[in-house]
Amino acid sequence: MKIGFIGVGKMATAIINGLNTTSHDIIISGSSLPRSREIAEKLEVEAALSHQELIDQSDLVVLGIKPQMFETVLAGLHFHQPILSMAAGVTLERLGKLTDPNLPLIRIMPNLNAQILKSTTAICANDKVSAELLATAKEITDSFGSTFDIPEKDFDTFTALAGSSPAYIYLFIEALAKAGVKYGIPKEKSLDIVTQTVLASAENLLQGTDSPHDLIDKISSPGGTTIAGLLDLEKTGLTASVVSSIDATINKAKAL
């Protein structure tokens, strides 16, 4: 299959790197021809002379453009093949209005971890997408991480939980590292300690059968240091703050 990418930002580039492990041919079209050629050379893929030329040559078109650019970029383009969009807030219905509602349309929501081929990606599709095409789309998303079938009505929630949450996790890691610095551990070493601990904690959760609550109980000895810290986190409203940030993220996604 020949896959064309309109828009080649960081996320599209990460996905292309994942696809380079597959047998698919890749063609790209960016904001300008010189830019497209520059990126194509780095990624070892083909550059199209224009968006329409890319469309005419592709079996599947991936839209890697920002949501606010959809109307401008898609105006005047004529599609004849399945389209896959990764834009936050752009529904399948809106995508159909901007392209062709009779085409097979697929929507995905990857996250930044696609850069290391470990994205957590949501996928949904309209009723024009065959089982075979959906399987191909999942093969694409699996090439740069793991894929979850998510109803489109839950995409904004998924965006918050998987798309935006890495930033919140990085903020938490940064805060823990700063606490280490406060008590005398150099920043680089403190950050390494915290990052390794977060990574191992996530792996422990994935590989075992215990819930987060179970693991918290195992770490929290009666009258110990961990329970003292946990109670202080709740005193300052950690859970409420996290849920509130998810609320804000979902509301922003709906407004796009």
Regions found by a protein language model. Give the residues of each.
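NAD(P)-dependent Rossmann-like dehydrogenase/reductase catalytic/cofactor-binding core
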Residues: 195-256
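Catalytic nucleophile loop
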Residues: 12
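Rossmann-like NAD(P)(H) cofactor-binding subdomain of soluble oxidoreductases
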Residues: 15-18, 33-34, 40-43, 47-123
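Aromatic-residue-lined binding/catalytic grooves and analogous aromatic/hydrophobic interfacial grooves
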Residues: 165
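Internal alpha-helical scaffold of NAD(P)-dependent oxidoreductase catalytic cores
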Residues: 94-104, 120-158, 170-209, 252, ...
